[in-house]
Regions:
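Polar/acidic, low-complexity leader/linker segments enriched in S/T/G and N/D
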Residues: 1-17
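Short acidic, glycine-rich loop/turn motifs
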Residues: 5-10, 52-55, 199-202, 271-275
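An acidic/polar, Gly/Ser/Thr-rich interaction patch typically located in mid-to-C-terminal regions
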Residues: 15-44, 182-314
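Surface-exposed cap/loop segments at beta↔alpha junctions
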Residues: 38-118
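Short beta-strand and beta-hairpin "edge-sheet" elements
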Residues: 51-80, 155-156, 270-300
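Short beta-strand-centered interaction patches in the first periplasmic/extracellular domains
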Residues: 75-89, 121-192
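Short, charged, solvent-exposed linker or helix-capping segments at domain edges/interfaces
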Residues: 90-96, 174-177, 310-314
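Polar, S/T/G-rich
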Residues: 101-115, 135-148, 198
Length: 314
């Protein structure tokens, strides 16, 4: 791993004595994170940006959040924690506004273009009204619209491109990777079996969405929500997301491999060993670690489940 620091005075420093570096990418988090420990003496310079490369490919492009330098009997050491460039969209509030027939492109132009991001989303739009409320972040304003229309969130890659986070069409086989360890986890404490809700003109929770998959698996976990204030297209998205999100930690694999995994988040995988057979698992988190002992990558995967939603009204 090659790491380049850029100071507030635009001076570039390529680290030569890295003790450890950990790059974390998570589908649920807007920002990737990179933590670094090194013994290069950078003195009192203030770091603004951090770049990380793997085999000359840019894998992290972000901003320094925290910088700590220590001198003791062991010598000089610095710790840096950085978040990817998506932090610019996360840390800034969007101005509140009600859009009529907005598209992802129109929100990008309003909220992200001037910050240097590039638009790489498909043609996502709605013919309805969309409200960006006070306190929403720039990231949240764009992500919510794209998610409600397409069912997929957005992601910012290392090239500052806003792309769609969607499930891969192909399925790779993890058995071809140099695997160090495998852990299988089944968590039955979270999946929701049904959502009961109120919509406009409802006085009771007389609208229902249940998961046929949850029923078949023996789950009985109900939620009651008041959705009177939401438009139908926003309401349907919220209910569907509640059920789907509840299954994310149901069946998981944690696999540590030797070296680096270049696969993107939401890549689908199959895996089979003495621990069991695992078909169609999504890559939800990737933790790449580098130190004097070499490099390894921890992959956290979740079962790709069709929750089979069924709707009915009393």
């Amino acid at each position: 791993m090659k790491i380049v620091l850029i100071t507030v005075d635009n001076e570039e420093i390529t680290l030569k004595n890295i003790i450890s570096a950990v790059l974390t990418q998570t589908a649920e988090a807007a920002c990737d994170s990179l933590s670094i420990k090194f013994i290069d003496n950078i003195k009192a310079v203030e770091i603004e940006k951090v770049l990380a490369y793997k085999d000359d490919e840019l894998i992290f492009n972000g901003y320094c959040d925290c910088q700590k330098s220590t001198v003791d009997e062991k010598g000089f050491q610095t710790y840096i924690y950085a978040r990817s460039s998506a932090c610019l969209l996360v840390d800034n509030d969007a101005f509140a506004y009600t859009y009529n027939c907005p598209s992802a492109l129109s929100l990008f132009q309003a909220y992200a273009k001037d910050l240097g991001f590039k638009f790489k989303l498909p043609n996502v739009y709605t013919l309805k009204k969309y409200e960006v409320t006070s306190g929403a972040s720039l990231f949240g304003a764009i992500n919510s619209l794209v998610s409600m229309i397409s069912g997929n969130g957005i992601r910012i890659n290392a090239s500052n491109e806003i792309i769609m986070l969607e499930v891969s069409k192909d399925i790779l086989n993890l058995n071809s990777y140099p695997i160090l360890s495998v852990k299988s986890i089944i968590n039955r404490s979270e999946p929701i079996s049904a959502v009961h809700y109120k919509k406009e003109f409802s006085s009771n929770y007389d609208c229902h969405t249940y998961s046929k998959s949850a029923k078949d698996l023996g789950f009985s976990r109900n939620r009651y929500v008041n959705l009177i204030s939401l438009a139908s297209w926003q309401r349907n998205y919220k209910i569907s997301k509640m059920i789907k999100d509840s299954f994310k930690n149901y069946k998981c694999l944690e696999i540590t491999i030797n070296g680096y995994c270049s696969s993107e988040l939401y890549q689908r995988f199959n895996y089979e060993s003495l621990i069991g057979k695992f078909d169609d698992y999504l890559l939800l988190e990737k933790i790449y670690s580098y130190d004097k002992n070499g490099e390894k990558c921890k992959l956290v995967l979740g079962k790709n489940i069709d929750v089979k939603e069924v709707n009915y009204v009393d």
